[in-house]
Curated annotation (Swiss-Prot):
Changing D256N: Reduces activity 23000-fold. Reduces activity 520000-fold. The gene is cgt. Residues 608-713 form the CBM20 domain. It comes from Niallia circulans (Bacillus circulans). Residues 1-27 form the signal peptide. It is an enzyme of class 2 (transferase). Monomer. It comes from the Bacteria. Substrate binds at residues 127-128, 167, 172-174, 220-223, 254, 259-260, 354, 398, 402. InterPro entries: A-amylase/branching_C, A-amylase_C, Alpha_amylase, Carb-bd-like_fold, CBM20, Glyco_hydro_13_cat_dom, Glyco_hydro_b, Glycoside_hydrolase_SF. This is Cyclomaltodextrin glucanotransferase.
């Protein structure tokens, strides 16, 4: 859904007022900890497990792998799952308003100590896996992990795990003794290592230079042993592994390095998750400053997962931290991303993480960080806060941005900003699901409005730390009345007086000031705010969240196909659970009609899969092209575009695994289905079809396959 609105005249709302101070409402189903498909009402707190809290010193590594002082930031420092449990139970996280935690990859990592340039390195970060079906003992046992899930859920906190199926661990192609040779284990049983890889578990194409997407997918990231996802053993193993963690009760998945794995395989992976136990999943696709990537948008819109919103993060850092852009640039980012992401509310927003310099610099004015937090917490998307941000941690690049959290103070201004604003996501659906509309702007001031039905939040930010701003002519959707700042003046905000037609009285926004004013009202007509997951096969139950659905069952529409009765498994005013009907594969608009027949808004771009999915590598040989031409693939199922050149898969690759004039691409297709397909050449609007009869093959019921054909002139 496109959720950035251009400024328009506000409509007066003749409704009773809810003033700026509020208390959390009783949890509705859409805001429940049991809602694993929707994180729009949540605030995520990212924890680097080893650097947070040592709750069980007995599981600390011994010898040279451990530094209890955390002086060498490339060694283990002792943080574990029991430490996180302790901080859940003592109220530090719940007091901050955190409702989801994202923890380091929990799987067993290598035990070797690797010396790079004279410095010892360990797998403290969790990204050097050896066995995806066992735990990292430095973090805890399976029982400890289960205790973490139970403790978090008891405090209404969801648990997201980092998952890095791109690679195992560092390896050397000519030194089998280096580290652990990238070896991969299946619950303790060795599957193979990087050298003498007779099973072809890994890629052996050298290291990536990041020059092309293909280069980044099929070559190694640095010295990490790159898994071959076109290998059936690897494919089945990774899908079985994530199902194990789903069975343990996780609520979400953060996928590492999604830009560096075959997109078709990842879609089949997400189908495996969504068809089994769907949870909110988001991937890491790094974008640099001012980088806008159509490939990034396409992946978010078609893969079945959302993304970490680096475009958002980089712009927030430019505007609030580095002063290299202004509020017009911030507005342009909001407008552009709303147009480019089909579900912009599902993208995970942040201001820093373990792969970037920390937002705060030790000598910087703290108000910059506090304003960036306020903006992120009240903007579209799912906000994620990196551990220690609330304690003003500073630090440059890896590993300095991964230090041990220095304290657990609840009195810092940053902690209190989060504490005051995080509950809005549960209490006011305008923050969780609403559109975004600029209401007042200059280089230093942005006043924006979030709106969902009759629910409204207005946020004013003056990033100029030295000069106040005189605000006149502000028009909002707030009903007539006086509104207290939700922050209670913590960032020098003020009360807002609103007259008829939403016109605000003139006021002065303090230097460095930030204020949030909000209003809630019952939603009388059905309004969809979120659908999750956004891709699954018929028969899978999906969750529709919003307001005003009513208490009696109505009807859910997938395109023109109506679903009612027993296929709607749950219907409440804020949440509907419905089984996907037996419709053909393809994209559908979803809408809801309540029991009285009143229709909701349309939620678009839902993909019904043609069935369970497998990843298949399509190869076409001797397809010569003119300069500017590329080869694409289409066929008889929706996953291949249903013979529509505009929806064809590609452009295909021709540099790494196969070389020009041979082309290849890994594609997610329905398992066990006989498929007809052809290749075509595209250059702009000109399409040249392959000649001859359609190619035909039957996809495997599980695992992967490669289909290799010659171009038919």
């Amino acid at each position: 859904m496109k959720k950035f609105l251009k400024s328009t005249a506000a409509l007066a709302l003749g409704l009773s007022l809810t003033f700026g101070l509020f208390s959390p409402a009783q949890a509705a189903p859409d805001t429940s900890v049991s809602n694993k498909q929707n994180f729009s009402t949540d605030v995520i707190y990212q924890i680097f497990t080893d650097r947070f809290s040592d709750g069980n010193p007995a599981n600390n590594p011994t010898g040279a792998a451990f530094d209890g002082t955390c002086t060498n930031l490339r060694l283990y420092c002792g943080g574990d799952w029991q430490g996180i449990i302790n901080k859940i139970n003592d109220g530090y996280l719940t007091g901050m308003g955190v409702t989801a935690i994202w923890i380091s990859q929990p799987v067993e990592n290598i035990y070797s100590i690797i010396n790079y340039s004279g410095v010892n390195n360990t797998a403290y970060h969790g990204y050097w896996a050896r066995d995806f079906k066992k735990t990292n003992p430095a973090y805890g046992t399976i029982a400890d992990f289960q205790n973490l899930i139970a403790a978090a859920h008891a405090k209404n906190i969801k648990v997201i795990i980092d998952f890095a199926p791109n690679h195992t661990s560092p390896a050397s192609s000519d030194q089998p003794s280096f580290a652990e040779n990238g070896r991969l284990y299946d619950n303790g049983t060795l599957l193979g290592g990087y050298t003498n890889d007779t099973q072809n578990l890994f890629h052996h194409n050298g290291g990536t230079d990041f020059s092309t997407t293909e280069n980044g997918i099929y070559k190694n990231l640095y010295d990490l042993a790159d898994l071959n996802h076109n290998n059936s053993t690897v494919d089945v193993y990774l899908k079985d592994a994530i199902k194990m963690w789903l069975d343990l009760g996780i609520d979400g998945i953060r996928m590492d390095a999604v830009k560096h794995m075959p997109f078709g395989w990842q879609k089949s992976f997400m189908a495996a998750v969504n068809n089994y136990k769907p949870v909110f999943t988001f991937g890491e696709w790094f974008l640099g400053v001012n980088e806008v990537s159509p490939e990034n948008h396409k992946f978010a819109n078609e893969s079945g997962m959302s993304l970490l919103d680096f475009r958002f993060a980089q712009k927030v850092r430019q505007v609030f931290r580095d002063n290299t852009d202004n509020m017009y640039g911030l507005k342009a980012m909001l407008e552009g991303s709303a147009a480019d992401y089909a579900q912009v509310d599902d993208q995970v927003t942040f201001i820093d993480n373990h792969d970037m310099e920390r937002f705060h610099a030790s000598n910087a004015n703290r108000r910059k960080l506090e304003q960036a937090l306020a903006f992120t917490l009240t903007s579209r998307g799912v906000p994620a806060i990196y551990y220690g941000t609330e304690q003003y941690m500073s630090g440059g690049t890896d590993p300095d941005n991964r230090a041990r959290i220095p304290s657990f103070s609840t009195s810092t201004t940053a902690y209190q900003v989060i504490q005051k604003l995080a509950p809005l996501r549960k209490c006011n659906p305008a923050i969780a699901y609403g559109s975004t509309q600029e209401r007042w702007i200059n280089n230093d001031v942005l006043i924006y409005e979030r709106k969902f039905g009759s629910n409204v939040a207005v946020v004013a930010v003056n990033r100029n730390l030295n000069a106040p701003a005189s605000i006149s002519g502000l028009v909002t959707s707030l009903p007539q009345g006086s509104y207290n700042d939700v922050l209670g003046g913590l960032l020098n905000g003020n009360t807002l007086s609103v007259g008829s037609g939403g016109a605000a009285s003139n006021f002065t926004l303090a230097a460095g000031g930030t204020a949030v004013w909000q209003y809630t009202a019952a939603t009388a007509t059905p309004t969809i705010g979120h659908v999750g997951p956004m891709m699954a096969k018929p028969g899978v139950t999906i969750t529709i969240d919003g307001r005003g659905f009513g208490s009696s069952k109505g009807t859910v529409y997938f395109g023109t196909t109506a679903v009612s009765g027993a296929d709607i498994t749950s219907w409440e005013d804020t949440q509907i659970k419905v089984k996907i009907p037996a419709v053909a594969g393809g994209n559908y608009n979803i809408k809801v009609a309540n029991a009285a027949g009143t229709a909701s808004n349309v939620y678009d771009n839902f993909e019904v899969l043609s069935g369970d999915q497998v990843s298949v590598r399509f190869v076409v040989n001797n397809a010569t092209t003119a300069l500017g031409q590329n080869v694409y693939l289409t066929g008889s199922v929706s996953e291949l575009g249903n013979w529509d050149p505009a929806k064809a898969i590609g452009p295909m690759y021709n540099q790494v695994v196969y070389q020009y004039p041979n082309w290849y691409y890994d594609v997610s297709v329905p398992a066990g289905k006989t498929i007809e397909f052809k290749f075509l050449k595209k250059q702009g609007s000109t399409v040249t079809w392959e000649g001859g009869s359609n190619h035909t093959f039957t996809a495997p019921s599980s695992g992967t396959a490669t289909i290799n054909v010659n171009w038919q002139p």
